Amino acid sequence: MSRVAEEILRRARALGLKITCAESCTGGMISAALTDIAGSSAIFENGFVTYSNGAKQKMLGVSQKTLADYGAVSEAVAREMAEGALRQAQADLAISVSGIAGPGGSEFKPEGRVCFALACAQGTQSETQEFGALGRPAVRQAALDHALNLIRVHLNSAH
């Protein structure tokens, strides 16, 4: 994955963009993947690890109503997380991740469900991926890989 992270840094630097992220189930893995690369300070603004609902509200401005209506693992919350990170960090691009890494989950929100959002000045897009009950480490790795790929695709389609 470092190849993808390196590509992200190279492209963001060329475009003069700053990136931030808001992470729940990945617990800082996206931030770590980006900052593992020398020179990342030129494009990585900061990261937010908002594991609890309270942290999502306090640090990112996620609304209590959205959390109550949709639950933490939802595209609605992922969108508010990304938009809040973008606003708080004053960055150009924000990625957010909220999911159920496991073990656990329910019939309606199964283990392996991860919601993503990507926010920038042009708007916010979100999606849900069902990775399945792969086990906690594998779901978290799949979420990291998918998040980095979303950033890469977005940057490669810009300009």
Outline where the language-model segments fall.
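Short alpha-helical segments enriched in small residues
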Residues: M1-H159
